[in-house]
């Protein structure tokens, strides 16, 4: 259930965000680097108080998003000043705020929607699953110019039947350490729920879904499967990699620009808080 803003307390907002990751060094704040989390600065300007966004997924350098979700806690008094009620009946509640942000933000990042978050909502820990898409072109000319920032050119034909068979060996709750860059204190156990391939002419698309992803996991999975697709490796090789306890150098990580974060799934509103507790416990138990 979503509560109306109360100026006497902080209000949690849900933000739906899209960005072209080409010129960003990922989501997370990094000293001296331009990152998507720099959205904090725009919100701080609008609300005249320091704020910090929490995202559903921290995308890597060069990775795009059409369906990133974040939350931010804003003092009710600051929110009421930054978002005066629209005089037009039927307009979205936060339309004035959305328009102010659109004027402040660079053209390669947009806040698509703003809403009061339901009670118990946490953009990261309430999430059930994240969906990514990876796109490649096997066209002899490479990639169409208007898609060059979002599609990876692949110089060889790919055997999608072999890639699909190898992908099935990776599904389920597993330790994906071999496909993840090390991050101190972070678990590499994830549930990979979908990894499917489709083809439309020269365009090949991977559809990837998991409860969560660790650092560089998606691009590493794609890189390993491409080695199967052009017959440098056997179908069973990817499954065999899972027996390794640390990241492998046996495959090349796929280029970042072909990857897009497209959607986050959440449970019904009355299950959000419980889901956040379960996720926190799960992440700390491994």
Curated annotation (Swiss-Prot):
Any Pfam family matching the protein: PseudoU_synth_1
Annotated EC: 5.4.99.12
Checking SUPFAM superfamilies in the record gives: Pseudouridine synthase
BP terms from Gene Ontology: tRNA pseudouridine synthesis
This enzyme catalyses: uridine(38/39/40) in tRNA = pseudouridine(38/39/40) in tRNA
Q: Which residues bind substrate?
A: 132
Keyword entries, A-Z? Isomerase, tRNA processing
Residues annotated as catalytic: 60 (nucleophile)
GO molecular function terms listed in the Swiss-Prot or TrEMBL record: RNA binding; tRNA pseudouridine(38-40) synthase activity
Q: Which InterPro entries match?
A: PsdUridine_synth_cat_dom_sf, PsdUridine_synth_TruA, PsdUridine_synth_TruA_a/b_dom, PsdUridine_synth_TruA_C, TruA/RsuA/RluB/E/F_N
Q: What class of enzyme is it?
A: isomerase
- Give the record's family classification: Belongs to the tRNA pseudouridine synthase TruA family.
User: What does this chain do?
Assistant: Formation of pseudouridine at positions 38, 39 and 40 in the anticodon stem and loop of transfer RNAs.
Q: Which HAMAP family match?
A: TruA
Q: How does it assemble?
A: Homodimer.
Q: What is this protein called?
A: tRNA pseudouridine synthase A
Q: Write down the species.
A: Mycobacterium leprae (strain TN)
Query: What is the gene called?
Result: truA
């Amino acid at each position: 259930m979503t509560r109306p803003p109360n100026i006497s307390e902080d209000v949690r907002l849900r933000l739906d965000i899209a960005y072209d990751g080409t010129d960003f060094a990922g989501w997370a704040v990094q000293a001296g680097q331009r990152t998507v989390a720099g959205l904090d600065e725009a919100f701080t300007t609008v609300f005249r108080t320091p704020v910090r966004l929490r995202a559903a997924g921290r995308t890597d350098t060069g990775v795009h998003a059409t369906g990133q979700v974040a939350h931010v806690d804003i003092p009710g008094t600051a929110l009421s000043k930054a978002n005066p009620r629209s005089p037009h009946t039927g307009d979205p509640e936060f339309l004035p705020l959305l328009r102010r942000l659109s004027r402040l933000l660079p053209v390669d990042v947009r806040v698509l929607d703003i809403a009061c978050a339901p009670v118990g909502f946490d953009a990261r820990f309430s999430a059930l699953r994240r969906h990514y898409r990876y796109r490649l072109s096997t066209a002899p000319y490479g990639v169409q110019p208007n898609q060059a920032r979002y599609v990876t050119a692949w110089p060889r034909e790919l055997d999608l039947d072999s890639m699909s068979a190898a992908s099935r060996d990776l599904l389920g709750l597993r330790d994906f350490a071999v496909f993840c860059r090390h991050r101190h204190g972070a678990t590499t156990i994830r549930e990979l729920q979908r990894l499917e391939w489709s083809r439309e002419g020269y365009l090949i698309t991977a559809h990837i879904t998991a409860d969560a992803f660790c650092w560089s996991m998606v691009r590493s999975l794609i890189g390993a499967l491409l080695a199967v697709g052009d017959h440098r490796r056997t179908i069973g090789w990817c499954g065999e990699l899972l027996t390794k306890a640390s990241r492998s150098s046996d495959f090349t990580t796929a280029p970042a620009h072909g990857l897009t974060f497209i959607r986050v799934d959440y449970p019904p509103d009355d299950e959000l808080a419980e889901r956040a507790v379960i996720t926190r416990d799960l992440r700390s138990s491994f």
